[in-house]
């Protein structure tokens, strides 16, 4: 099934703790070239909730429960200088991992203090924060025809994965999401799955990186020739997290 099947968070089981939401906003120059100060007076948080019977609520609040779900974590980045053909990122997650997702962004687009920098509005820095191509203007066409990555290999304890000849960028952008029943992105976002059905919470395969040697477990990427900009390699991974609810308190395992 393609249903995520994620468990609900039992708020009644953490009655001795506070549930807080922390929002961190980008600088204004990240998303606009407006020079006047913009403000957000208020916003709403919309939740999907289930109301249960008092007896069930008492059971959930009074008994020990263990829930396993998947979470997304950000991996340390890697800077790649212009003209560099080969770059390696040591993979250091400390949890069982379902999927790896990575992309490349030109360094000038990463400076949140700058919003200008192009000869047209579409080539300004603020308009290209989510431009993962080698073009200076984002569009679906530029993402398709200008990928910064040529090919990639993943080495696990020195053994290369996947064990196929054609590991070019389109393998990780199109084939892996298709065979894993994931959405195929318009942007140049690359995926490798250790799970058969990564969209589902129920375990269907993973790789426990905590049991591996990080210096022999790397993402080895080959960049396109002729790139004139510096790039930053961003990698995120989806892993399993265990939550224990007991005595009104939640703890992480």
Tell what function each PLM region has.
Residues 1-253:
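Flexible assembly/topogenesis modules
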């Amino acid at each position: 099934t393609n249903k995520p099947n994620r468990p609900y968070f039992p708020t009644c089981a953490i009655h001795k703790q506070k549930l807080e939401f922390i929002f961190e906003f980008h600088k204004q120059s990240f998303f606009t070239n407006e020079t006047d100060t913009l403000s957000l007076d208020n916003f709403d948080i919309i939740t999907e909730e289930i109301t249960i019977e008092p007896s069930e609520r008492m059971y959930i609040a009074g008994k020990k429960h263990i829930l396993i779900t998947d979470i997304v974590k950000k991996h340390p980045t890697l800077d790649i200088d212009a003209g560099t053909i080969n770059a390696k990122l040591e993979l250091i997650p400390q949890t069982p991992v379902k999927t790896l997702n990575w992309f490349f962004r030109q360094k000038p687009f990463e400076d949140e203090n700058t919003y200008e920098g192009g000869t047209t509005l579409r080539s300004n820095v603020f308009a290209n924060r989510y431009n993962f191509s080698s073009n200076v203007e984002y569009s679906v066409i530029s993402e398709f025809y200008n990928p910064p990555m040529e090919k990639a290999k993943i080495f696990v304890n020195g053994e290369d994965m996947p064990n196929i000849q054609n590991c070019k960028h389109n393998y990780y952008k199109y084939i892996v999401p298709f065979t894993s029943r994931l959405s195929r992105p318009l942007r140049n976002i690359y995926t490798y799955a250790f799970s058969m059905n990564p969209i589902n919470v129920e375990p269907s395969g993973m790789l426990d990186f905590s049991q591996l040697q990080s210096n022999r477990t790397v993402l080895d990427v080959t960049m396109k020739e002729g790139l004139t900009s510096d790039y930053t390699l961003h990698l995120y991974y989806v892993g399993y997290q265990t939550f224990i609810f007991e005595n009104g308190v939640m703890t992480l395992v």
